[in-house]
Amino acid sequence: MEDVLDLGEAPSRRSGVKMGRRARASQENQQETADASRNQPGREGPPKPLRQGGWADDSSGPSKSTKRMTEDVEDSRLKQQSLDESDEGEDIPVIPDLEDVQEEDLALQVASPPSVQVNRVLTYKDLDNDLMRHAAFQTLDGDIDLKLLTKVLSPEPEVREENVQWDWDLLFTEVSSELITEWDVGKMEKEDMLKPSPLVS
């Protein structure tokens, strides 16, 4: 339902959206009726001022002149310069053809290993020989005396053990026999301690 307010306007007939010339013509008719209603002497209140401004404002002023100057500067930057001016002082780089470029086979190039001086690591045998023969190794950095250490060092054959495969039964009998002998020795010592010693008077 449409409510029509009595503001001195005739009820308008609503139809579909108007496009083209008809839409412009209806807008002009509405503006003419609005101007005519403003000019009527019997109407109360002051006339409504026409508002202009925004994007479509064509008023001239100081801000408009500065806008034009900035637009001119931007336009000159965006305009393409002529080819004659740009070619005067600059050389155009030439892209070489693929046939002119010699292919380098990177697979055949091997990087050289880094050259770092590495001290040779001595074996135990070398260390033993040097330690026993040279008295210079008996002090370390001139401050630490190694003579006591060299006196108690054992030779390598005495320290090195052979790799022997263990048999469970044999290992069990060896360990059990050693435990029994230790137990027997401990038992005998206790008995000796518990025996009353003859009192000497």
UniProtKB/Swiss-Prot annotation:
Bias (Basic residues): 15-24
This protein's UniProt keywords: Cell projection, Cilium biogenesis/degradation, Cytoplasm, Cytoskeleton
Localization per record: Cytoplasm, Cytoskeleton; Cell projection, Cilium
Biased composition (Basic and acidic residues): 68-78
Membrane-crossing residue ranges in chain numbering: none
Pfam family, one: IFT43
Keyword Hydrolase: no
GO cellular component: cilium; cytoplasm; cytoskeleton; intraciliary transport particle A
Region (Disordered): 1-100
A GO biological-process term: intraciliary retrograde transport
Biased composition (Polar residues): 26-40
Compositionally skewed regions (Acidic residues) per UniProt: 84-100
Function, in words: As a component of IFT complex A (IFT-A), a complex required for retrograde ciliary transport and entry into cilia of G protein-coupled receptors (GPCRs), it is involved in ciliogenesis. Involved in retrograde ciliary transport along microtubules from the ciliary tip to the base.
Family: Belongs to the IFT43 family.
Subunit (UniProt): Component of the IFT complex A (IFT-A) complex.
Protein name (record): Intraflagellar transport protein 43 homolog
Native species: Xenopus tropicalis (Western clawed frog)
Origin organism lineage: Eukaryota, Metazoa, Chordata, Craniata, Vertebrata
Gene, per the UniProt record: ift43
